[in-house]
């Protein structure tokens, strides 16, 4: 299953109790969950219980949002290698914040040893990583990208950063569209990056040409976009239009429930 930017935006346009929540509330809840997960002790016997409670809460929210399970799994697996590379080496590393280590009696090659403390720390890192990624996937899947930027602007981020985020979101879709056209043209010419019958150097040259073409097209598009913005009155004092809404009862209930889950998971464990 292939997930594209368009698929992400389609999920965000669904109608569910989670989708109808105020974007500011969802953004703050995501930030709060990430801060909670990151701020937990490096190693503690109750860490996994606390994180499991929060993860269960996120899974329930995903179910209420009617998100496609296959879509969630594919997005999660796409990000997993970035954190897994750091997590896997932890059992073999002696972290400086431990005073002593308990070595497992395993005969490993290259003189490697696995410590109980390193393994515990690695498992804790994995649990934190899963919770943080789940929160981000839920936010991006249940909230339109423009609404996320608008919520961040209302919460006080500088307008310059909000403008950059807005432009980045637009250019992501433009970049994907350009890349698809280039890939379609290459396929029509029977170009296959994994073709073993073609010299690898030639394939790398074609990849370099593709990257160069995208860079030049992005530069030209940026110039055209900037000129269009100036023609529409863009300047130093320009502001981003934000549709301000008052918080409703579901938003308040969601905020309270999120805080209760986080505080409860910490106190009861």
Give the location of each predicted region:
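Hydrophobic transmembrane alpha-helix segments characteristic of membrane transport
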Residues: 53-60, 146-151
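Membrane-interface starts of transmembrane alpha-helices
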Residues: 25, 49-50, 158-162
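Transmembrane alpha-helix interface motif
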Residues: 1-43, 52-57, 177-269
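Short, hydrophobic transmembrane alpha-helix segments
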Residues: 36-47, 64-71
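Alpha-helical transmembrane segments and their membrane-interface exit regions
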Residues: 56-64, 80-85
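Alpha-helical transmembrane segments and their helix-start/interface "positive-inside/aromatic belt" motifs
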Residues: 69-81, 251-255
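Juxtamembrane/interface alpha-helical elements of multi-pass membrane proteins
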Residues: 75-197
